[in-house]
Amino acid sequence: EANLLTDPFDGLVRRINPGGTVLNGRRVDTPQHPAGFVRKLAGMGGAKAPLVPVDIAWRAQPDAENTPFPTFSATYLQFLPPELIKGKIVLIGAVLSITDRHRTPLSIIDDGDRGNMPGVMVQAHGITQILEGRRPPTVPVSWTIGLLALFATLGTGLSLLRMGIVFNVGI
């Protein structure tokens, strides 16, 4: 199942779809609900894929000109040296300009090709994350609590100041 999970709140693709279905508290694969594409392919590559949706750790571009993954047109395949793809996982899919485009969290910084990716590229990000054992960056809970306390204190302090209507309207 190559379906992507879109966030119901904003429609962005953020998580890897494990596929399957949950029966009696366990995720199982059935003919109606097979394993997700990333989980299936990662298993073939010898990695253990998660059984729950996990955030995608988007792979960075090597530079401004190149994509995170090498891409080749099918018309040039016959001219490529076999060593280029030998022993590698190769995904074959369409990279069309209008169809099969999915908004990702990267659309915040680039609303073009990086932010609206073809499905095959989203799957490639998920597969390499599992095979490389990468996790998405997270903020430690202590930082979250500290920032929350700081801004709550700052907001409370500002609200206690009585500097007239100009100050209150300006904030």
What are these regions (language model features)?
Residues G155-I171:
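Juxtamembrane interface at the cytosolic side of transmembrane helices
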Residues E1-T153:
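Flexible inter-domain connectors and hinge/loop segments
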